UniProtKB/Swiss-Prot annotation:
Function: NDH-1 shuttles electrons from NADH, via FMN and iron-sulfur (Fe-S) centers, to quinones in the respiratory chain. The immediate electron acceptor for the enzyme in this species is believed to be ubiquinone. Couples the redox reaction to proton translocation (for every two electrons transferred, four hydrogen ions are translocated across the cytoplasmic membrane), and thus conserves the redox energy in a proton gradient.
GO BP term, pick one: aerobic respiration
One term under GO cellular component: plasma membrane
Name of the protein in question: NADH-quinone oxidoreductase subunit I
Residues that bind [4Fe-4S] cluster 2: C74, C104, C107, C110
The encoding gene: nuoI
Catalytic activity: a quinone + NADH + 5 H(+)(in) = a quinol + NAD(+) + 4 H(+)(out)
Family recorded in the similarity comment: Belongs to the complex I 23 kDa subunit family.
Assembly behavior: NDH-1 is composed of 14 different subunits. Subunits NuoA, H, J, K, L, M, N constitute the membrane sector of the complex.
GO molecular function, one term: quinone binding
Compartments where located: Cell inner membrane
Pfam families: Fer4_7
Length: 164
């Protein structure tokens, strides 16, 4: 009978409710852990692998020599390359260089396979698209990413050069 009386008093006094409110009040006055994503961003690690980038040489010439090693090594088969046979006789160039970002698993094997460091992983990964076809990055988009993130990519590659 004594145990039943304790349970009745606990349920009438709503002990669990007051315990929960105490926990809530305790956490209410602590600093926030949550990051408000679009406005605030967490810093990425130096070796973060984001959206792909095609690089150019300092003179503006494309680095890619259309060897297709990145296409061959990609485990997800996310890279598609066509060789441009009509443009120059002394150097092979790509006519089509497409990457399906939804297929890609961001493993970095394409970056490791490239003999001229033409394709590297960029410093950002924002994949909020309104159109499903936006997941396909074409050659001009990849080159534009390379130009806009050039300083960050060069700094990362120089810092990581001793491990390559």
């Amino acid at each position: 009978m004594g145990n039943a009386m304790k349970q009745l008093m606990a349920s009438l006094a709503l002990r669990e409710l007051w315990q929960g409110m105490a926990v809530t009040l305790r956490y209410m006055f602590r600093p926030n852990i949550t990051i408000q994503y679009p406005e605030e961003r967490t810093p990425y690690s130096p070796r973060f692998r984001g959206i792909h980038v095609l690089r150019r040489y300092e003179g503006g010439e494309e680095r890619c020599v259309a060897c297709k090693l990145c296409e061959a090594i990609c485990p997800a088969q996310a890279i598609y390359i066509e060789i441009d046979t009509e443009s120059r006789a002394d150097k092979r160039l790509t006519k089509v260089y497409d990457i399906d970002l939804f297929k890609c698993i961001y493993c970095g094997l394409c970056e490791e396979a490239c003999p001229v460091e033409a394709i590297v992983m960029g410093p950002y990964l924002d994949m909020a698209y309104e159109d499903r076809n936006a997941r396909f990055y074409k050659k001009d988009q990849l080159l534009a990413n390379g130009e806009s993130w050039r300083a960050e990519i060069d700094a990362r590659l120089n810092a990581d050069a001793k491990y390559r």
